[in-house]
C-alpha cells in the first residue's frame, strides 16, 4: 500500500488541497473533512459505531486507556502485551494484574469495581492469536470492558476487518468493546484509530 502508485497519486492531489500539516490542535484548526470522512469509513468498515483518529497507535493506546481507566479501577492484561499497553496501564495508577499469556484472568475484580481486560489480538513477537469468544465470555460474566489492540490483525485477518470481524460473528451477548487499529502496518500509512461505542468515542473526543 505504501508504494502503490494510485495511493501515491491520490496523496499528491490531496496535499495540494489540504497542505502537509494541520497547523493546530484537533479541537481548534487541526481537523479537516478528510479526518471525519476517514473515521466514518473505518467505523463502517469494521462494523463499529464510531472511531477516533490519533497520530500513532502508541498514542491511541495511551490516550484511550489513560482517559477511560481511573485509579479506582482494575485492569487485567496479558503478560506479553505490547509496551504501549503496559505503559498506558502503569500511567493510570490503577490496580492491575498480568494474566498468563492467551489465558483469561483467574480472579475477577472486587464487587463494585469497574474493570478492564486489555490484550493484543495478534501478538507481534510470535504471532500468537487470542480467542475472542473466551475473552468476550469472561467480560460478560464479570461486567468488564474488553480493549483489544488489533495492530497486527487489521488489514490481514477477518476479510481485512481484523478482530472486529470475529467479534461481529460471535453469537449471543457481547461486552463493551474497544478496538485499536493502526494505519501504519497493513495499510502502509501512519496513525492509530480507536473504535467502539459512540458514547465512549464522544467522551474521548
Predicted region positions:
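Active-site phosphate-binding strand-loop segment of PLP-dependent enzymes
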Residues: 97, 101-148
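Conserved active-site segment immediately N-terminal to the catalytic lysine
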Residues: 163-183
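Conserved PLP-anchoring active-site segment centered on the Schiff-base-forming lysine
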Residues: 64-83, 105
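Short beta-strand-to-turn element immediately C-terminal to the catalytic PLP-Schiff-base lysine
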Residues: 2-3, 156, 164-167, 192-198
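Conserved N-terminal alpha-helix of the aminotransferase class I/II PLP-enzyme fold
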Residues: 8-56
Amino acid at each position: 500500500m505504501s508504494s502503490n502508485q494510485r495511493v501515491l497519486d491520490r496523496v499528491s492531489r490531496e496535499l495540494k488541497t489540504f497542505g502537509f500539516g494541520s497547523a493546530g490542535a484537533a479541537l481548534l484548526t487541526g481537523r479537516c473533512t478528510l479526518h471525519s470522512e476517514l473515521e466514518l469509513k473505518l467505523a463502517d468498515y469494521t462494523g463499529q459505531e464510531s472511531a477516533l483518529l490519533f497520530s500513532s497507535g502508541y498514542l491511541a493506546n495511551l490516550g484511550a486507556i489513560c482517559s477511560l481507566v481511573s485509579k479506582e479501577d482494575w485492569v487485567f492484561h496479558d503478560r506479553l502485551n505490547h509496551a504501549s499497553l503496559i505503559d498506558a496501564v502503569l500511567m493510570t495508577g490503577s490496580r492491575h494484574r498480568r494474566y498468563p499469556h492467551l489465558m483469561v484472568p483467574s480472579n475477577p475484580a472486587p464487587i463494585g469495581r469497574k474493570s478492564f481486560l486489555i490484550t493484543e489480538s495478534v501478538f507481534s513477537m510470535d504471532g500468537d492469536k487470542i480467542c475472542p469468544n473466551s475473552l468476550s465470555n469472561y467480560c460478560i460474566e464479570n461486567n468488564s470492558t474488553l480493549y483489544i489492540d488489533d495492530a497486527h490483525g487489521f488489514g490481514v485477518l477477518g476479510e481485512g476487518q481484523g478482530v472486529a470481524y470475529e467479534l461481529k460473528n460471535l453469537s449471543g451477548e457481547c461486552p463493551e468493546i474497544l478496538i485499536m487499529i493502526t494505519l501504519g502496518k497493513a495499510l502502509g500509512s501512519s496513525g492509530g484509530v480507536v473504535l467502539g461505542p459512540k458514547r465512549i468515542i464522544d467522551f474521548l473526543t
